[in-house]
Amino acid sequence: APERGLFLNLSAGELCVGSFQCKSSCCQRETGLSLARCA
């Protein structure tokens, strides 16, 4: 079961921790220090 408070099915540009959260299955960091976003 997914953890409570974990967002799934996110749209492009939304903050993500892992690619499993994104509709596109692509979670990318633009730089090493920035937060990752769905692509």
Swiss-Prot record:
One of its GO terms (molecular function) is enzyme activator activity. One of its GO terms (cellular component) is extracellular region. It comes from the Eukaryota. Its main location: secreted. Disulfide bonds join C16-C27, C22-C38. It is found in: Secreted. The keyword Secreted applies. Expressed by the pancreas. Gene3D superfamilies: Lipase, subunit A. Keywords: Digestion, Disulfide bond, Lipid degradation, Lipid metabolism, Secreted. The keyword Disulfide bond applies. GO terms for biological process: digestion; lipid catabolic process. Belongs to the colipase family. Forms a 1:1 stoichiometric complex with pancreatic lipase. Colipase is a cofactor of pancreatic lipase. It allows the lipase to anchor itself to the lipid-water interface. Without colipase the enzyme is washed off by bile salts, which have an inhibitory effect on the lipase. This is Colipase.
